Amino acid sequence: MRSRAGIIQVPEGRRVIAPLSVAENLQLGRQAAGVRGSDAADLERVHPLFPVLMERRNQISGSLSGGQQLMLAIGRALMGRPKVLMLDEPSLGLAPVIIKDVFRALVQLNREGLTILLVEQNAKLALQTAHRAAVLEQGRIVHQGPAAELADDPVIADHYFGRAAGLAA
């Protein structure tokens, strides 16, 4: 966690502290980032995005579903008041309805001014969510630009999605 630089990562695999409650996990995000003072404003930011965290605040984190653990990991990161939120494969292994909820929250956070760096294996979803995108092959950037342009590029669509039409197909 690089909270001093304002960068906080939500790693692949969620990594919640399983024996602690949801509320305790959220507080760890503040402590790790060195945030002082009342947590009320931070909780007011997290709970509307992920109401289940408020409902389950006293539940042991390890008993949450995978989607709920991801929401908790993102909530914990937000408690540290990041300037940049990095997410590694947030959709991995989640049900489509949970993915939709999580990405809706990410879009909202971005609209509120939070910069989000997203590494995502679901290219269609990533390009529908992002403003800008980069396509990497073997650790090298092979395409980059506005996400909408990449999504409509027939070469990228054919190579990465197996069709010559854009992502809308």
Task: For the regions a language model picked out, list residue spans one by one.
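Glycine-rich phosphate-binding loops of nucleotide-dependent enzymes
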Residues: 1-169
